[in-house]
């Protein structure tokens, strides 16, 4: 048992040495440029020199913005004229017409219960239009059953 383990360890070490040799950079390849560290006590040298760095909002700034939004929400409940959300709500609740994007009601909801019972007994359905009633066949086709 110990012999098997020692053979496996030797194989792993052999593979590792081959891998290390393979991954070593050759003398012909150029490596990354060396990093130059300049130590200084100046405050300006401690600032990042990247122009792409964007300062993040601090936690107190975020809390202040949240508090301001809460205050404006409270003002809207007091003065509904100034609140845009309230005016939009009134616009849709006062207008009796449905928006054009709304799906129309299905006809089975508009048909009275008495007519529906009659359709179930006879098995024939009629649809009313301006000309009168038009037979459509069985109620199964309309989905009334």
Curated annotation (Swiss-Prot):
Annotated stretches, region: Disordered: 1-58
Comp. bias (Basic and acidic residues): 1-27
Biased composition (Polar residues): 38-52
InterPro entries attached to this UniProt entry: BCOR (IPR031628), BCOR-like (IPR047144)
Matching PANTHER family: AGAP007537-PB, BCL-6 COREPRESSOR
Family label: Belongs to the BCOR family.
Protein name as annotated: Putative BCoR-like protein 2
Gene label: BCORP1
